[in-house]
Amino acid sequence: MNGFSDLNPSESKPSLSQLAPLEAILFDVDGTLCDSDPIHLIAFQELLQEIGFNNGVPIDEKFFVENIAGKHNSEIALLLFPDDVSRGLKFCDEKEALYRKIVAEKIKPLDGLIKLTKWIEDRGLKRAAVTNAPKENAELMISKLGLTDFFQAVILGSECEFPKPHPGPYLKALEVLNVSKEHTLVFEDSISGIKAGVAAGMPVIGLTTGNPASLLMQAKPAFLIENYADPKLWAVLEELDNKS
C-alpha cells in the first residue's frame, strides 16, 4: 500500500541467532511476496461501489487495513454482508476474479525478494508459501512472480481446519516440510499472519508494505522491515550464516 515506514525505533540491531542452523523459511503471499494490497483495494472499491455499499462512497485505505487485509474470505463475507453470508461469499468470488484480472498485468516482486530466494536456494533451505488467499490467486501470483519451482509446498488456509490467524496453516507447513519450529523463520505483512506465525512458535519478520508498523507491532513480530533489501534483514541473515 503506502509502504508504511514508521519502523520500531527501539529495535536497532535485531538477532535471530537462536534459529541456527536455519532449516526453512515460510512466506505469506499477498503483501509479502508482492505489494498486492493496493490491487485488492481497487477491486473491493469497484465492486462495493457498484452495489451501493457505504451509500456508494468507496471504502478507503483505513477501512481496508482495519477490516479486510490479511483476512480469509469467510470473515470478509460475514463483515460485509452480516445478514446474507452466502451473498457475501459470492461477492468475494466476484472480487477475486476481478483481482486476478488486474494483478496478472501489474504484479512484481518486492525489492530484494529475488536476491533472498537465491540466498535460500544456495543454502539448500526448505521453503513454503502459507496463505489465506484462494488457490487460484495463490497459484497465479506465485507463477507470475516466477516462484512456482522455488516453493516446495503451498499451504492454503482454506485447506486447513482454520485459516490464519490460527496457527494451523503454519503448523501444517512445518509438518509437510519436515522441519522444526525452532529452526524456521516466517515472513508476513498482516496482523492476522504475524499472529499465526507467532502462535505456531516461530519468529516472524513483519513487512510494512500494507500496514503501519504501530499496528503490526501489536502482533509481536521479531522485527519489521520495509522490503527484502533492508540492511537490517541481511545483517540478521549474515549472523545466521556465521552461526551455522
UniProtKB/Swiss-Prot annotation:
<keyword id="KW-0479">Metal-binding</keyword>
<dbReference type="InterPro" id="IPR041492">
    <property type="entry name" value="HAD_2"/>
</dbReference>
<feature type="binding site">
    <location>
        <position position="28"/>
    </location>
    <ligand>
        <name>Mg(2+)</name>
    </ligand>
</feature>
<protein>
    <recommendedName>
        <fullName>Haloacid dehalogenase-like hydrolase domain-containing protein Sgpp</fullName>
        <ecNumber>3.1.3.-</ecNumber>
    </recommendedName>
</protein>
<dbReference type="Pfam" id="PF13419">
    <property type="entry name" value="HAD_2"/>
</dbReference>
<dbReference type="GO" id="GO:0046872">
    <property type="term" value="F:metal ion binding"/>
</dbReference>
<dbReference type="InterPro" id="IPR023198">
    <property type="entry name" value="PGP-like_dom2"/>
</dbReference>
<dbReference type="InterPro" id="IPR006439">
    <property type="entry name" value="HAD-SF_hydro_IA"/>
</dbReference>
<keyword id="KW-0378">Hydrolase</keyword>
<feature type="active site" description="Proton donor">
    <location>
        <position position="30"/>
    </location>
</feature>
<feature type="binding site">
    <location>
        <position position="30"/>
    </location>
    <ligand>
        <name>Mg(2+)</name>
    </ligand>
</feature>
<dbReference type="GO" id="GO:0050308">
    <property type="term" value="F:sugar-phosphatase activity"/>
</dbReference>
<keyword id="KW-0460">Magnesium</keyword>
<comment type="function">
    <text>Acts as a phosphosugar phosphatase on a broad range of sugar phosphate substrates with preferential activity on D-ribose-5-phosphate, 2-deoxy-D-ribose-5-phosphate, 2-deoxy-D-glucose-6-phosphate, and D-mannose-6-phosphate and with a lower activity on D-fructose-1-phosphate, D-glucose-6-phosphate, DL-glycerol-3-phosphate, and D-fructose-6-phosphate.</text>
</comment>
<dbReference type="InterPro" id="IPR036412">
    <property type="entry name" value="HAD-like_sf"/>
</dbReference>
<dbReference type="InterPro" id="IPR023214">
    <property type="entry name" value="HAD_sf"/>
</dbReference>
<comment type="similarity">
    <text>Belongs to the HAD-like hydrolase superfamily. DOG/GPP family.</text>
</comment>
<feature type="binding site">
    <location>
        <position position="189"/>
    </location>
    <ligand>
        <name>Mg(2+)</name>
    </ligand>
</feature>
<feature type="active site" description="Nucleophile">
    <location>
        <position position="28"/>
    </location>
</feature>
<dbReference type="GO" id="GO:0005886">
    <property type="term" value="C:plasma membrane"/>
</dbReference>
<dbReference type="InterPro" id="IPR051600">
    <property type="entry name" value="Beta-PGM-like"/>
</dbReference>
